[in-house]
Amino acid sequence: TVGGVWAKLDVGIENAAELDGAGKWQTFRFITFPMLRGATTSAAVLVFLYCVTSFGIILLLGAGKVSSIETEIYFSLTQFLDFKTASAYALVQTVITVLAFAISKRIGNGEAGVETPTEIETSSGLNRREWPVVVVSVIFVIGVLVLPILNLLAKFTWAGFQSLSGNGQRGLLNISVWQATGNSLRNIVIAAGLALLIGILVSWLLSRSKRSWLEIPFLLPMGISSVVLGFGYLLSIRAGWLTVPLVQALLATPLVIRIVHPALVSLGTDYRDVAVTAGANGWQIWRLVEAPMLSSVLRSAAVFAALVSLGEFGAASLLSYGDQATLPVVLYQLIGRPGPENYSMAMAACAMLIVFVFAISMTSALVQTRRRSS
């Protein structure tokens, strides 16, 4: 959000301020940041929603001592079968989400931006005053992301990998990890496909409408947690393997909209007017003009949708039963039960999940690099 809007700012204004004697900090404080206030507010609301709807992290690291609205909903359903309490918590969480979106729309104007290949300019490089910020950022990323991943990979064993075809120590799992992986891959195809289809259609409609409030209903699933959505599906549709990818598609659709819609708006309307004058209809304009121009953006949206489906745990923990368990659900079951075999299988499953994420991300990056070089 912030990066996309920042990339579109007029650099000439900052250069003019520096020529007048303003330093880097003064330029950022009085010129750059006021122009980024809307995007910063939207990003802050998004971070808040991700924190307040966090489920898997609280469940794993909280160790029963730390709870959230999401974990209370989960335990009310799975341990006490208390649907009334779970419904009350779900209502509170939904109200928080609606209020957060209202604040974002009121203060931040819902501003968002996505960098497209045509907007990326070659930088003149970093100067000495900017290097400390870069170093601190790199250290932070290494500390909170890279080191834990490397620690997981270091504990991977071949024996644990070979055990993935089994059901764990004392028959813990209903299905093998490989079967759960197959379920996750199937869900990725369905969820990412539906999210991309719905997200593109909604983005296309929003780009042709001047009513910005129409975007809010489609973005609500971004703030409403997967546990609440899974609970809703559990009450209305009941069990069934298709409910999991449907919820995952619903969760991924707002991300697709947030990526595709700003990119569509940034294209302007000149090309559309020319195409209409030439006799093209809406479908032809999208297929022959807009889609080719947004190919990299659509690819990024597909990657995000696939990653959301792959790592989704909240709804799957409520809706995936028996032989329909997904990879994150099986991983949680292995981590939650003691035993050397379960532990080694959990480390192997973690490594496999990391490889999947890396492969999906790198495939998109390689395709985009080849297109740029050609």
Annotate the PLM regions.
Residues 94, 98-101, 123-151, 212-218:
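N-terminal signal-anchor/first transmembrane alpha helix
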Residues 58-98, 155-175, 310, 316-366:
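Interhelical loop and adjacent transmembrane-helix boundary motif
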